[in-house]
């Protein structure tokens, strides 16, 4: 009985295929075209893997988006991961960390409070990190944190009065690396240290005014907030390039060569929570429109896993161990800088001087407020 039934079904499908072969061919071509286009828009993937057991990696922006994918990758490779959070972890974050430890079979995943938009929070964390004898191990710093405000939103400032995007995208990471410099320099000569920082193509639009870094005295570009992000990314890339050069010029007590490698990774346009906030204009109706256009976003843009491939490449590829120049990675390949200011030492010195002055002013104002509160 089963054999005649199977024969009947096979014959029916065969006849149906012959009758409607044109429709099936068109459908197959359409599906293949969409799949090929999606494969192209997803970008390149890295094939490198790396054993990171025993390594200590510090990650900013590791609680969502690309940073979250990077944290999971590092944990799966066996690294001890320190995730820097803006606030004390809530129950959701605690559950996520516990689940991540279970999935990756790695118990060495921790969180620390370090709000990159607050210079005082960064100083408190970084000072605590370096206040240790012997020097704490630190193999890698991955800077994934970033803020991009939606268009037509008013200027947002931190509690310390600094423009939010400038503080989070540049001034906070700058403060962190500036204070952690002794720890980075103090690592054993045989230990390779990497700094991997997120950037984006908006750095090409950067136009930094050293007398007004966060545009506090200029009209805020409500229609194009990415210009502020462009300033921050240009500043960060310039500082990282200078940071690497000064590390190479630093003479170690053991006379060994510099083993620091700085890589800036451009993930491209990725469907992250930050992107969703920007294209939805931070509104409920915008979010509804974003959901309606989801097939369009899915087809054209990368997911977080594909967006993180350049980070995976920067973390795992052995080619960077032999490169002494700070490099920019896009689609898992080293590319040239589009702004000559990044490699200009005079531009870097002006930037560092202005950033130091801004941080000093922020900390000075905080001390004044603290004294006033204590007198009340």
UniProtKB/Swiss-Prot annotation:
**Cellular compartment(s):** Cytoplasm; Endoplasmic reticulum membrane
Q: Which residues hold NADP(+)?
A: 66, 115, 178, 233, 270, 272
Which positions form S-S bridges?
none
Q: What is its main location?
A: cytoplasm
How does it sit in the bilayer? Single-pass membrane protein
Decide whether keyword Endoplasmic reticulum is in the record: yes
The record's annotation in Pfam families points to: adh_short
Look up the EC number in the record and give it.
1.-.-.-
**Which residues are on the Cytoplasmic side of the membrane?**
302-376
Gene3D superfamilies the record matches:
NAD(P)-binding Rossmann-like Domain
Q: Which residues lie on this side of the membrane: Lumenal?
A: 1-280
Question: Catalytic residues?
Answer: 233 (lowers pka of active site tyr)
InterPro entries per the UniProt record, alphabetical:
NAD(P)-bd_dom_sf, SDR_fam
Give TM regions: 281-301
Q: CDD domains recorded for this chain?
A: retinol-DH_like_SDR_c_like (cd05327)
- Mitochondrion among keywords: no
Which Gene Ontology molecular function entries are recorded, alphabetically? oxidoreductase activity
Q: Which GO terms describe its cellular component?
A: cytoplasm; endoplasmic reticulum; endoplasmic reticulum membrane; membrane; nuclear membrane
Q: What family name appears in the similarity comment?
A: Belongs to the short-chain dehydrogenases/reductases (SDR) family.
Q: Which PANTHER family match?
A: RETINOL DEHYDROGENASE, RETINOL DEHYDROGENASE 14
What does the record give as the function of this protein? Answer: May be involved in lipid metabolism.
Q: What is this protein called?
A: Uncharacterized oxidoreductase pbr1
Species classification: Eukaryota, Fungi, Dikarya, Ascomycota, Taphrinomycotina
What gene, per UniProt, encodes this protein? pbr1
């Amino acid at each position: 009985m089963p054999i005649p039934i199977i024969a009947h079904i096979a014959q029916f499908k065969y006849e149906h295929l012959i009758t409607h072969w044109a429709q099936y061919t068109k459908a197959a071509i359409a599906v293949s075209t969409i799949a090929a286009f999606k494969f192209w828009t997803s970008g390149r993937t890295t094939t490198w893997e790396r054993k990171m057991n025993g390594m200590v990696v510090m990650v900013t922006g590791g609680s969502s988006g690309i940073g979250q994918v990077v944290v999971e990758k590092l944990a799966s490779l066996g690294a001890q991961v320190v995730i820097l959070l803006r606030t004390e972890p809530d129950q959701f974050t605690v559950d996520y960390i516990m689940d991540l430890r279970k999935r990756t079979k790695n118990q060495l995943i921790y969180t620390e409070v370090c709000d990159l938009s607050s210079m005082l929070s960064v100083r408190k964390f970084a000072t605590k990190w370096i206040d240790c004898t012997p020097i704490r191990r630190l193999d890698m710093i991955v800077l994934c944190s970033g803020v991009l405000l939606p268009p037509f939103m008013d200027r947002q400032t931190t509690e310390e009065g600094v423009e939010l995007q400038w503080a989070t995208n540049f001034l906070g990471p700058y403060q962190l690396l500036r204070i952690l410099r002794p720890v980075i320099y103090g690592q054993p000569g045989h230990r390779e240290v990497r700094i991997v920082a997120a950037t984006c193509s908006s750095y090409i639009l950067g136009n930094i005014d050293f007398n007004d870094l966060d545009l506090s005295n200029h009209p805020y570009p409500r229609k194009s907030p990415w210009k502020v992000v462009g300033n921050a990314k240009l500043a960060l890339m310039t500082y990282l390039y200078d940071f690497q050069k000064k590390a190479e010029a630093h003479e170690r007590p053991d006379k060994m060569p510099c083993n620091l490698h700085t890589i800036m990774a451009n993930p491209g346009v990725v469907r992250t929570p930050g992107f969703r906030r920007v294209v939805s204009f931070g509104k409920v109706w915008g979010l509804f429109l974003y959901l309606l256009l989801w097939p369009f976003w899915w087809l054209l843009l990368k997911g977080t896993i594909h967006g993180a491939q350049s980070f995976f490449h920067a973390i795992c590829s052995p080619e960077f161990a032999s490169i002494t120049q700070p490099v920019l990675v896009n689609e898992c390949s080293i590319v040239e800088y589009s702004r000559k200011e990044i490699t200009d030492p005079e531009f870097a010195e002006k930037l560092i001087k202005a950033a130091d002055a801004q941080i000093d002013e922020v900390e000075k104002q905080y001390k004044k407020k603290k004294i006033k509160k204590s007198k009340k």
